[in-house]
């Protein structure tokens, strides 16, 4: 069987609140680490979320 194109990743908050999102990305076309600006409900602000591994 072929390896799937999309993998699950964890987006960790840069505000160090411990909050994270889980999403998918295409590992073949998006080789760099994903950085998105999303809402962190712990501090109730939009902050950057950086890609990390799912443990």
UniProtKB/Swiss-Prot annotation:
GO terms classed as biological process: translation
Domain of life (superkingdom): Bacteria
Residues of the signal peptide: none
One Gene Ontology term, aspect cellular component: cytosolic large ribosomal subunit
Keywords assigned: Ribonucleoprotein, Ribosomal protein
InterPro entries documented for this protein: Ribosomal_bL33 (IPR001705), Ribosomal_bL33_CS (IPR018264), Ribosomal_bL33_sf (IPR038584), Ribosomal_zn-bd (IPR011332)
Any one GO molecular-function label of the UniProt entry: structural constituent of ribosome
Family as reported in the entry's similarity comment: Belongs to the bacterial ribosomal protein bL33 family.
Protein name listed in UniProt: Large ribosomal subunit protein bL33
Organism of provenance: Caulobacter sp. (strain K31)
């Amino acid at each position: 069987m072929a390896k799937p194109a999309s993998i699950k990743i964890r987006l960790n908050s840069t505000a160090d609140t411990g909050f994270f999102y889980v999403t998918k990305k295409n590992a073949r076309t998006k080789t760099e680490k994903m950085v998105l600006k999303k809402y962190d409900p712990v501090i109730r602000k939009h902050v950057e979320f950086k890609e990390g591994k799912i443990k």
